[in-house]
């Protein structure tokens, strides 16, 4: 089984990891057709519970807070 010959330094490890987080994109937001609040694409709205014009979940105060 292959084993690393030398230990990677903290700075080298952190440099490698930092590039991954810089490449991440924020989630795509769009306006809900029912209530107008911002929501994540292809997901039900947290505020009103609608998705593609249908009520799919009951909105609760816990989701909004």
UniProtKB/Swiss-Prot annotation:
Sequence ranges of Basic residues compositional bias: 1-18
Biological process GO annotation list?
Answer: translation
Gene Ontology CC: large ribosomal subunit
Q: Which residues form a coiled coil?
A: none
- For this UniProt record, give its keywords in alphabetical order, as a comma-separated list: Ribonucleoprotein, Ribosomal protein
Family annotation (Pfam families): Ribosomal_L32p
The record's InterPro entries line, in alphabetical order, gives: Ribosomal_bL32, Ribosomal_bL32_bact, Ribosomal_zn-bd
GO molecular function (one): structural constituent of ribosome
The family line of this record is: Belongs to the bacterial ribosomal protein bL32 family.
Q: What PANTHER family does UniProt report for this protein, alphabetically?
A: 50S RIBOSOMAL PROTEIN L32, LARGE RIBOSOMAL SUBUNIT PROTEIN BL32
Name of the protein this chain belongs to: Large ribosomal subunit protein bL32
- The organism is Salinibacter ruber (strain DSM 13855 / M31)
Lineage of the organism: Bacteria, Pseudomonadati, Rhodothermota, Rhodothermia, Rhodothermales
């Amino acid at each position: 089984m292959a084993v690393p010959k030398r230990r990677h330094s903290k700075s080298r490890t952190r440099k490698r990891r930092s590039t991954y987080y810089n490449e991440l994109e924020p989630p795509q937001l769009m306006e809900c057709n029912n209530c107008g609040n911002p929501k994540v694409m292809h997901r039900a709205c947290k505020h009103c519970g609608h998705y593609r014009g249908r009520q799919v979940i009951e909105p609760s105060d816990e989701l909004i807070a």
